[in-house]
C-alpha cells in the first residue's frame, strides 16, 4: 500500500516518503519513463520494476504486514503476493537510505519533459 511505503521510507531512510520522493526524477512518484537521473531515481525505477513483477494483488492498494526486529523490517503474513509488495517497498526504502548522500534537490519536482528518452528494460 502506498501509505505503508511512505511509512517504511520514514522508518528506514528517516525522511518523509511523499515529500522527498513523491516528485523526484523520472521514476519517483506516479508513472515513470526515460532514463533514471541518479542513484535515488534508480531506486524508484527498480521499485517500479519490482511492482511490475507482482501478480495476484495490487501493490498500490493492498495492505501488507511487517514487523521490526532488531532494527530491521521483516515482511510477513500468509499472503505471498502481499509479502512480495512489502519486500519491494522495504528494498526501495533501503536503497533511498543508502543513497541519501547523493540525493540532489535539482531532481525534486523534476519536469517530465526531461524524461523523454526510451526507458531501459527492467
From Swiss-Prot:
Function: PLA2 catalyzes the calcium-dependent hydrolysis of the 2-acyl groups in 3-sn-phosphoglycerides.
Tissues expressing this chain: Expressed by the venom gland.
Cofactor, free-text remark: Binds 1 Ca(2+) ion.
Cofactor(s) the protein requires to work: Ca(2+)
GO terms under biological process: arachidonate secretion; lipid catabolic process; negative regulation of T cell proliferation; phospholipid metabolic process
SMART domains according to UniProt: PA2c
Keywords annotated in UniProt: Calcium, Disulfide bond, Hydrolase, Lipid degradation, Lipid metabolism, Metal-binding, Secreted
Protein name as catalogued: Acidic phospholipase A2
An example Gene Ontology CC term for this record: extracellular region
Record-stated family: Belongs to the phospholipase A2 family. Group II subfamily. D49 sub-subfamily.
Disulphide linkage map: 26-115, 28-44, 43-95, 49-122, 50-88, 57-81, 75-86
Record keyword Mitochondrion present: no
Location within or outside the cell: Secreted
Binding site for Ca(2+): 27, 29, 31, 48
Catalytic residues identified in the record: 47, 89
SUPFAM superfamilies, per the entry: Phospholipase A2, PLA2 (SSF48619)
Ranges that cross the membrane: none
Molecular function per GO: calcium ion binding; calcium-dependent phospholipase A2 activity; phospholipid binding
Reaction(s) the record says it catalyses: a 1,2-diacyl-sn-glycero-3-phosphocholine + H2O = a 1-acyl-sn-glycero-3-phosphocholine + a fatty acid + H(+)
PROSITE patterns registered for this protein in UniProt: PA2_ASP, PA2_HIS
EC number: 3.1.1.4
